[in-house]
A protein has these predicted regions:
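Soluble extracytoplasmic regions of secretory-pathway and membrane proteins
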Residues: 1-553
């Protein structure tokens, strides 16, 4: 009981799910938005694609891909988004001059965004925001990124040197930093900085002016640590596009302790954790705001009393709309709940009902599943919402016994729940589905055929998709040619429901086929094998071809 309280698990709503309801056309229609937002692109290959197709210059880099949700043209869309940051270490050697590194190359530029569930005809992501300058479905009015995830050095703005903004063919667009949050470089400040950096060029340079500012601590994690080092911070900040078109980073802050009475430690030491703080850093100005999001946490209340000016009270709506429950915290909580959901002392002592994370095949390796975000409609709700979820399997078994979720939207943010499946019924777990995919003669022959043709076959994340009282399983298949410049392309979608497994070119085709099999009452062993189809195009040789026309996959 005390361990559950220490990890915020004492108010979890427990629910029952049959897990075996029949998938029907009506059920699909009722959950259209859930199915519309099933993630088919995976972050790992997508990051490679963004870095090849959306950087345009060697000194730009996408550090990671983040999942978020936006309302675009009245539609709730789950998206991937990445920031195009500047990496001065990747400048050509001849360009690594003092002026370039300190005065000219000062910031990254813009973001790219793509649908989680759509690809072009070539299997590449369908962009919602792309290119330089930024084009697409949202207005990005202040695309300059002076503060980000990169290990940024200090730079000087408002010098006599125009700052590089972005490339425009044979010439470059320039920019001037217009915020006033830097350190004025005049008088004693200028001398102290020159001494600290060991750069007397700063002290005597005729390129600086009275308006010149020094921008320090430009790595956003370093920046928030300088202000509030008593919190620990999530290592996966994510960037958002605000309503005014500016860019901002959201960072989850944690309060931890090793002193909670009679609570089990999750890492051998600390036995209490709360995500009580959200830090928001403006990507342009570097302004930092801390927001308290768990007012019931006594430790964060203590910090608020010690530092009364630390927290900003009012959370802007366009920021709050992008709050995500952090994966790292949820993973800790889900791990602990796998043991401490047991309330019977004898069962707990013998670990008779221990739950663990399932495994899946990802990039052709068996790995432990991570929690993942999904857009879905809970059984008792009228509309879809952003959920972070994790399936469970019993210890040393592969069937799915339950799944845990936490809500992310609006006033329901942070509400946790668990759906249990009946112990007397077998609901397939992720690894069981992976094994059945391996054993399916048609699918395995197709995958082997493409591999033998010189292409690399990559199986993406297997997603468990709860649909009312049943479960759907979806796994994308990437094909990558052997060419050095090739990119992984989504070419097939594997879908499983109960005893049926199909593989088709698109999500819609796979779903349509599953529905036909269910409605016909045909058993899987009665389904004739399909002829091998070896006409799937190999990956694009130059990795840069795209089609304007796209399709739902």
């Amino acid at each position: 009981q005390l361990t559950r309280a220490a990890y915020g698990l004492d108010d979890i709503e427990q629910k029952e799910s049959r897990g075996d309801a029949t998938l029907t056309e009506d059920m699909v229609e009722r959950n259209e938005l859930t199915l519309h937002n099933v993630r088919l692109n995976d972050s790992r290959p997508l990051l490679d694609i963004y870095n090849q197709l959306q950087t345009f210059r060697t000194y730009y880099q996408f550090n990671d891909m983040d999942i978020d949700r936006y309302e675009i043209d009245g539609e709730y869309e789950q998206v991937f988004i990445g920031a195009r940051e500047l990496s001065t270490k990747d400048l050509p050697d001849q360009a690594k001059t003092w002026v370039n590194k300190n005065l000219r190359y000062t910031h990254g530029y813009g973001v790219s965004m793509s649908h989680v569930n759509k690809v072009t005809g070539q299997g590449q992501p369908e962009y919602m925001l792309r290119n330089i300058p930024v084009e697409g479905s949202l207005d990005v009015t202040q695309p300059q990124i002076y503060f980000g995830e990169e290990d940024y050095p200090s730079v000087i703005t408002n010098s006599k040197v125009d700052e590089f903004d972005y490339p425009t063919g044979d010439e470059n667009a320039t920019n001037r930093y217009e915020a006033d949050l830097g350190i004025p470089l005049k008088g004693i400040n200028k001398a102290l900085f020159a001494i600290k950096e060991g750069s007397f060029r700063t002290l005597f340079s005729d390129q600086l002016t009275k308006e010149s500012q020094l921008l320090k601590h430009r790595n956003i994690i370093d920046r928030v640590n300088e202000i509030a080092p008593f919190f620990t911070y999530d290592d996966d900040p994510y960037i958002i596009v605000r309503e005014d078109g500016s860019l901002a980073w959201i960072i989850d802050g944690y309060v931890r302790s090793d002193g909670y009475p009679y609570s089990e430690a999750y890492d051998g030491k600390e036995n209490y954790i709360r995500n009580s703080v959200k830090a928001v850093v403006d990507a342009y100005s570097g302004e930092v705001n801390f927001y308290m999001v768990d007012e019931e946490d006594p430790l964060v209340q203590t910090y608020a009393k010690m530092f009364p000016d630390l927290f900003t009270e009012e959370i802007p709506e366009d920021v709050h709309a992008h709050f995500r429950y952090p994966v790292d915290l949820f993973k800790i909580q889900a791990k602990m709940y796998g043991t401490f959901h047991m309330s019977n002392l004898e069962v707990f002592y013998n670990r008779e009902d221990y739950w663990e994370f399932p495994t899946e095949k990802y990039f052709n390796e068996d790995i432990e599943m991570d929690p993942y975000y999904i857009t879905m409609k809970l059984a008792e709700e009228d509309k879809e919402e952003f959920i972070l979820m994790m399936p469970y399997t019993p210890k040393k078994r592969q069937n799915m016994i339950a799944w845990m979720g936490v809500r992310n939207d609006g006033e329901n943010y942070g509400d946790m729940f668990v759906y249990r499946f009946p112990k007397q019924k077998n609901v397939y777990g992720p690894q069981q589905i992976e094994n059945r995919i391996n054993q399916d003669s048609y699918i395995s022959q197709q995958l082997n055929l493409w591999s033998q043709g010189g292409s690399k076959v990559i199986r993406g994340n297997l997603l468990v998709i709860p649909i009312e009282d049943t479960v759907l399983y979806v796994e994308p298949v990437y094909i990558e040619s052997s060419n050095e410049t090739s990119l992984p392309e989504v070419k097939q979608v594997i879908m499983a429901y109960e005893d049926h497994i199909v593989m088709e070119e698109t999500f819609d085709k796979s779903l349509e086929k599953i529905l036909k099999l269910v409605e016909s009452g045909v058993k899987p062993e009665d389904v004739p094998e399909e002829p091998l189809d070896d006409d799937i195009e190999e990956g694009s040789e130059d990795g840069e071809k795209e089609q304007d026309e796209s399709e739902d996959v």
